[in-house]
Amino acid sequence: AEGIPVLEDRATPLVFNRIPFWLAGVSDFWEAAHDVRRALTGVDEASPVIVVTHNPDVFPEIPARVALTIAGHTHGGQVAVPGLGRPVVPSQFGERYAIGHIVEGGRHLFVSTGIGTSILPVRFRVPPEISLVTIRSAIPLSQPSS
């Protein structure tokens, strides 16, 4: 789309509610060469960073300085069988990064099930979703003096 930057292994600085942060995009782990280091080139070490990527399998490569990684790809496995779990999750890590908010070593990953399907048009006990992620600053905003 015109005027919208594509963040394939690159980052852009943003400001929201007077809080500066970086948004970095990492190419799809399975579909293309991806370079996390290149995606974070130029990002100030002290600035908060949010990484967006298609496939959560890249999460082990994301450095601890990244505040949040957001991904999709797995569709939550599309099928969840009570007592058996998710028999098929398109990930080298199985159910580990299949769905939801995952915290590992103090790092945060959010994986959405999305609204579509892959291979077969079937979902069972894994409803489609459009996620709303609320991000709050750990640093309180200074109040203007009166």
Annotated model-derived regions:
Residues 2, 19-22, 47-49, 65, ...:
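Envelope-exposed proteins and targeting segments
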Residues 10, 27, 113, 134-136:
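Residues at the C-termini of beta-strands that transition into short coil/loop
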Residues 31-45, 51-71:
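Active-site-proximal loop/helix segments of hydrolase catalytic cores
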